[in-house]
Amino acid sequence: MQRQLDRLHRQLKLTQAQEAAWAQFADTTLGNVRQIDDLYKDRAQHFEAMSAIDNVKNYQTIIQREAEGLGRRAVALQALYDALSPEQKQAADRFFRYQEERREQRYMARHSG
């Protein structure tokens, strides 16, 4: 995720005045990633001992935390996006569109056939 953030930061060519909004967005994004990574690591450590219901409830917790994190990320992204110039907004739109296309391609490669 850090590489993606670094790439987006370079593409946006932010001004000094925009850096605070960027820092909030990047910190929120990385905090969310760390939280979910920790939850999956904990899940892996306890997976063998989980009952079927524990498994589903644990996964539900992870998905809920992902959704909460996505909400925080959306708020931080909105603040950043509002500070961008029209050209920077276009760059951000392209970046996120490209990321989503890649995610869809990976999903389809795993689930087709």
Language-model segments: which ranges?
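Charge-rich (acidic/polar
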Residues: 1-113
